Curated annotation (Swiss-Prot):
It holds the Pfam family TSNAXIP1_N. The gene is C6orf118. Residues 152-174 are annotated as: Disordered. Residues 152-161 have a biased composition (Basic and acidic residues). InterPro entries: TSNAXIP1_N. The lineage of its organism: Eukaryota, Metazoa, Chordata, Craniata, Vertebrata. Residues 346-375, 423-453 form a coiled coil. This is Uncharacterized protein C6orf118. The keyword Coiled coil applies. Keywords: Coiled coil. It comes from the Eukaryota.
């Protein structure tokens, strides 16, 4: 029964064909029963909603829109600052604890942490004592740095029985931490290589009581341990050290007397400076010292091998040469002869250089002539062996080279040379200008002569008038 009545239940909405008016007509049954050909109710409702939305939009977009009407500004009265501040929603209904209670809770936590800490053992056999006291003689640990056992026990008893925060006068609440000493290497001399490394302990610069003390300890640490001043004085190349040794050598040489013929004092000064260089050089000190020892041994052996009689003979000859009188005229004559010999030698050397250059030039010309003759002979032989096509190609290359030379000559003529007619015209123009200049000069002289007579007469008249006045 339901299936038979189902086609009658489907209705169809039909719009009127009247233009500009959207109304609904009467209901109309489907022509074909049993087939769902009527419009869907959902589509009809969507169309109705769309039309209604268009009508509303048309109404609010015109002059009847209340948002487009004139709205005078509202006067908002604020009796105190932040009166209309937006109120934030509270996360929970629980209120904040008072500040006094928070402070008491923090103090209770700190008190519990400090007074329940374990006290380290002070026995000398413990690892902590050996770490804090690397050397018994250099240790600065005092009894005040640690809490005494009796004081700790009394503090615990007081904490159990009495109120917190009160105790005997010897009881301390907190430990005073002391920074350990630093173990640094002792400086050694450059020559002492085989000795064992030595260390010493210095106090840390962070252990100062005030900032000024820490700064002074830091400067002393830089000077004694880091030794930065040595890095500033000595560079990597060693130029400053070399300049210092050179300055010392010059000062020592100026102090000694140069009158003695035997320069043993100078050798002594050189030896001392060389020994200073060996001691100051950290890398090559040992090597330089070995070289110095070998040289001194060689000199000692050489001096011992020479007999004393030969020394005395040489010394006598030196004294005789020093006491021999020498005339000034002989010295001047010898000096003049030496100058003449030097001049002749220079002239001979210049002549030798000139002849050598001429010889090299002749050899080069001879070599070029020989090569030219060989090339011409080879060229003739090659031409006889060439085929007709190769000869044509060769002539073509020669013609092209000649054509390039002709083009270069034409370019040079256009850029550098001048036509003969132009040069003749220029010469004639120069001659005419010179002739005009001569004419103008002649006319100028004639005019000067003509003006000279009246000018003298005028000057005489002026003199007469002056005398009359």
């Amino acid at each position: 029964m339901a299936e038979e009545r189902e086609p009658e239940l489907y209705l169809k909405w039909k719009h009127c064909e009247t233009p500009g008016v959207k109304t609904l007509c009467n209901l109309k049954h489907c022509e074909t029963p049993g087939v769902k050909t009527l419009c869907n109710l959902k589509k009809l409702l969507n169309r109705l909603q769309k039309d209604h939305r268009e009508d509303v939009y048309l109404y609010i977009s015109g002059h009847l829109n209340p948002n487009k009407l004139y709205q005078p500004p509202e006067t908002i009265l604020q009796h105190w600052p932040n009166a209309h501040r937006p109120k934030g929603e509270r996360a929970s209904e629980v209120g904040e604890p008072p500040a006094g209670k928070v402070a008491r809770m923090k103090e209770a936590l700190a008190h519990f942490t400090i007074h329940t800490a374990l006290v380290p053992s002070e026995a000398q056999d413990t690892p902590l004592f050996r770490y804090l006291n690397p050397q018994a003689s250099l240790s600065h640990t005092s009894e005040e740095d640690f809490l005494p056992v009796e004081a700790v026990r009394e503090g615990k008893e007081e904490k159990k029985g009495g109120p917190p925060g009160r105790g005997p006068p010897g009881w301390r609440r907190r430990e005073e931490l002391r920074l350990p000493d630093l173990k640094v290497l002792c400086y050694q001399e450059a020559g002492s290589r085989g000795t064992r490394d030595r260390h010493h302990y210095v106090s840390s610069y962070l252990a100062g009581a005030t900032s000024a003390d820490r700064y002074r300890m830091f400067l002393r640490f830089q000077k004694e341990v880091l030794a930065k001043q040595d890095l500033l004085k000595n560079d990597f190349t060693g130029s400053k050290a070399a300049a210092g040794h050179e300055r010392k050598l010059q000062q020592e040489l100026q102090k000694i007397c140069t009158c003695s013929p035997q320069q043993f004092n100078r050798l002594h000064v050189f030896g001392k400076v060389f020994e200073d260089i060996c001691n100051s050089s950290l890398i090559f000190g040992d090597l330089l010292k070995k070289v110095k020892d070998e040289y001194e041994l060689y000199m000692a052996t050489l001096l011992e091998s020479q007999p004393a009689a030969q020394y005395e003979a040489l010394l006598a000859q030196l004294k005789a040469l020093g006491q021999r009188p020498v005339k000034t005229a002989d010295m001047d004559l010898a000096r003049e002869e030496l100058r003449m010999l030097v001049t002749a030698t220079k002239a001979a050397l210049e002549q030798n250089d000139r002849l050598r250059s001429e010889l090299e030039m002749e050899v080069a010309l001879l070599q070029s002539a020989k090569e030219r003759s060989e090339s011409s002979e080879k060229h003739i032989i090659d031409e006889n062996r060439l085929t007709l096509t190769e000869k044509v190609e060769k002539k073509r290359c020669e013609i092209l080279s000649k054509w390039d030379e002709i083009q270069a000559l034409e370019k040079e003529i256009k850029t550098t040379l001048v036509h003969t007619g132009i040069s003749d015209i220029t010469e004639n123009r120069i001659k005419s200008i010179e002739h005009e200049a001569i004419q103008l000069e002649t006319e100028n002289m004639i005019l000067k002569k003509k003006i000279k007579g009246p000018l003298e007469i005028y000057q005489g008249i002026c003199k007469i008038r002056g005398n009359r006045r």
